[in-house]
């Protein structure tokens, strides 16, 4: 088939376009930043790893057409229009905003991360990750991650961006529906850097600790900064994140309060169920220190009573997990309530089997007794 541009590029039949279940992790995807596409270039780079083996080394335009057909099949027109507007919004910011620290926009591992974290990542073993981490509550991991100078530079970059927003009277989108302050890092040039952070630093850890929620197939992200102070957002209500895995790192500065409170992992059906005592956990932020948890782990933030707290948050998502989840009904491998229901069903089944066994044994014993004379 010849594509619509009439340039003679052969594109596989749209009726057979499929993705494979597991990504080609060793494959280096193309760079799509220079193309005018209906979707984010980062999405194409992530999706490329799921192309059939025969497609991986095809010409870039062939791969683009192949992936576009799949995306159009599943993405409504309204979603494409929204994505187009978001791209235009981001381009307007990137064209006009002058970064303060351009070195932040590309990963410089030794400048960004503490040595212990880098060592564990380079070894890429579960025991190496555990050696630098604490697990104060099941499924919640804390560890030192960022260098102090990186935290300070990112804080300075946020202040510079907010100053530009104020001076230019540019109306920006906030990180989510719950935070009225802060900024989406992806919107002012950090998308590629954060994608690299997810791919090379968060996904290896998530693959080891969160395989049941797609930790090994994370392929997109939403990265943002949030601000808490008496004249900013003060606290954050009880919620779950729109992510499979969430990285939350305190950048500073001086503050009191702001503790995170966790209340158990839940699927959509059980998100409003009661908390069990063993699921209660509170966490106090430390600048430079990260906390990693499942996105479906219910949590909130207590009031910041003085000072100013700023956190970097990276929601990491897996399109593969989300697609598979649509066809699943049992989430007992990660939902606390599903797990309790499953254990209760097992307990009842064992109890019923014991009763039945005792009944059979009683009947056998009665049959074996000699008849009364």
Where are the regions a protein language model picked out?
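Catalytic core of non-heme Fe(II) oxygenases with the double-stranded beta-helix
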Residues: 2-4, 207-337, 370-373
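Generic preference for well-ordered alpha-helical elements
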Residues: 40, 44, 60, 64, ...
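Fe(II)/2-oxoglutarate
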Residues: 1-138, 334-373
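Short, functionally important structural connectors and interaction interfaces within domains
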Residues: 27, 92, 105, 137-138, ...
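Non-heme Fe(II)/2-oxoglutarate
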Residues: 3, 101, 105-216
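A broadly tuned preference for mixed-charge, low-complexity surface segments
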Residues: 196-202, 209, 300-302, 306-318, ...
């Amino acid at each position: 088939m010849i594509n619509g541009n009439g340039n003679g590029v052969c594109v596989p039949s749209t009726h057979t376009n499929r993705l494979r279940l597991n990504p080609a992790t060793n494959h280096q995807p193309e760079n799509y930043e220079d193309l005018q596409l209906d979707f984010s270039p980062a999405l194409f780079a992530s999706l490329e790893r799921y192309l059939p083996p025969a497609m991986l080394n095809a010409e870039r335009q062939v791969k683009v057409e192949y992936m576009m057909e799949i995306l159009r099949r599943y993405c409504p027109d309204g979603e494409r229009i929204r994505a187009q507007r978001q791209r235009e919004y981001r381009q307007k910011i990137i064209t006009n905003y002058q970064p303060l620290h351009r070195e932040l926009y590309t990963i410089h591992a030794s400048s960004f991360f503490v040595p212990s974290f880098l060592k564990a990542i380079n070894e890429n073993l579960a025991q190496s990750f555990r050696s630098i981490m604490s697990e104060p509550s099941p499924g919640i991991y804390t560890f030192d991650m960022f260098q102090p100078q990186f935290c300070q530079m990112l804080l300075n970059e946020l202040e510079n961006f907010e100053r530009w927003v104020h001076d230019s009277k540019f109306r920006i989108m906030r990180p989510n529906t719950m935070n009225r302050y802060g900024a989406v890092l992806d919107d002012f040039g950090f998308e590629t850097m954060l994608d690299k952070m997810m791919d090379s630093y968060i996904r290896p850890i998530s693959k080891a600790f969160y395989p049941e929620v797609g930790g090994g197939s994370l392929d997109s992200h939403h990265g943002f900064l949030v601000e808490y102070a008496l004249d900013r957002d003060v606290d954050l209500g009880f919620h779950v994140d729109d992510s499979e895995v969430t990285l939350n790192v305190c950048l500073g500065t001086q503050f009191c309060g702001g503790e995170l409170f966790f209340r158990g992992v839940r699927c959509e059906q059980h998100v409003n169920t009661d908390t069990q005592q063993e699921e209660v956990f509170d966490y106090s932020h430390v600048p430079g220190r990260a906390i990693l948890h499942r996105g479906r782990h219910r949590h909130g933030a207590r009031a910041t009573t003085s000072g100013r707290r700023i956190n970097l948050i990276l929601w990491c998502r897996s399109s593969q997990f989300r697609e598979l989840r649509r066809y699943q009904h049992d989430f007992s491998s990660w939902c606390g309530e599903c797990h309790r229901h499953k254990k209760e069903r097992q307990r009842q089944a064992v109890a019923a089997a014991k009763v039945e066994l005792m009944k059979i044994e009683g009947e056998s014993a009665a049959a074996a007794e000699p008849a009364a004379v």
